[in-house]
């Protein structure tokens, strides 16, 4: 019942919050202008931008240059961190390959962590590098999505200014909400301090070091920005990051807030005036929510069912291996599905200890990479499947392929197919390399089917810019650092470039007025068709490897 109430509340909150996002996205005046405008203008002066509207090509150039500059600075700071200030625990520099992986991971909103948060980064890099990139990577994804929506919806004839979009989103959305969430988490016991690690003497007489630091400030944007990188190695399973059931709900709600609001925002932009949500967006929301609930149900069923091997020995009950007692199997499964559906990557339980079908659910969500997804890019990925569905359905019934009165031609379809293929190609090719390259497979700690699942999960998490992992994998090696770094880089930027190209190509075409020869995208049957094509196309791509991984493991448990 608590899960149903939580999900219902989040749907209502995101629907209302999308109205505020609408005013932020379209640079409309609001009551908060007196608070934020001066700070925004100061940021624009520091950046040196004159807020001129950019072409799509210029927008992408500035997006890539901004991200490239941040990535370079991050890499440099990580390899010299031991000589900088705010290092009371005397942590050492990261190796070149690990710094490469870490910089790309946080730059691309993935937060795949091959390092130990307690010992491999300093307070300075946690705050200046990790926390800063959590803001900018999230805002970058939002900015390119808004640029795409402006063109697709025809609400304006401009794509916008990259720096204006990113600054407004950080100042008016991320910063206020992060401060609020940080305060809420601190009231639940999450630390926020620059004090060095505590050194205590245990009852047995041994000395123990307890790691903590400025956790609350990182924890808030970690979930709000769908980042996922933890201050501590145990992530949100540790009491310092996620002390109780209330902090657990705060963190889950933070993950869901912006991606769900973006879908409603799309509907408000389609309705032109923003006071209501267009039926097309509601159909998309219901379709994605249906997939989300289906996988949540499957995951919870598997985790409550427990391990059949133990059941045969007379030991019944849910699968509690790798889980925190304060959350139990139900809230652990919910957190797992949310963190993979919304591509956050934070964890409150050990995913490597999930049952085979329990691990299949989050893996499938990352393979689909469209069920709400991350900040901005999740909606962009969904729209690719929408365009693909419109095109196929139109040809199947002999109608004209068009979307929002824009005809879909050969050029757009080539880009759409490329975006669709990049994701599975990166996952499958690099997974195969992990088994072929000498030394790479030595990181696998489980034999047979589960070992394949470990590799597939790691590569899928990197390709989906998620960041969670089956942490039984020994991934801090040169191969895993470089390979997952390349995957995160390619899977983030190539689709974004192609998606903006698709939007620009569509709007440059002559408007096509909808008639009886076009597919109605605001009807329930379109939502059903979308679900079928998402499952069918992704299923044909990944079913063979899933049979070798979690499904094969499930069939062997008796």
UniProtKB/Swiss-Prot annotation:
Main subcellular localisation: membrane
Annotated localization: Cell membrane
Keyword terms: Cell membrane, Ion transport, Membrane, Potassium, Potassium transport, Transmembrane, Transmembrane helix, Transport
Keyword Transmembrane: yes
Transmembrane domains' residue ranges: 1-21, 66-86, 127-147, 166-186, 245-265, 281-301, 327-347, 354-374, 377-397, 416-436, 482-502, 531-551
UniProt entry tagged with the keyword DNA damage: no
Topology of the protein relative to the lipid bilayer: Multi-pass membrane protein
GO annotation, cellular component aspect: plasma membrane
GO molecular function, a single term: potassium ion binding
Gene Ontology annotations of biological process type: potassium ion transmembrane transport
Disulphide bridges, residue numbers: none
Pfam family, one: KdpA
Function statement: Part of the high-affinity ATP-driven potassium transport (or Kdp) system, which catalyzes the hydrolysis of ATP coupled with the electrogenic transport of potassium into the cytoplasm. This subunit binds the extracellular potassium ions and delivers the ions to the membrane domain of KdpB through an intramembrane tunnel.
Subunit and interaction comment: The system is composed of three essential subunits: KdpA, KdpB and KdpC.
Similarity annotation: Belongs to the KdpA family.
NCBIfam families xref list: kdpA
Descriptive protein name: Potassium-transporting ATPase potassium-binding subunit
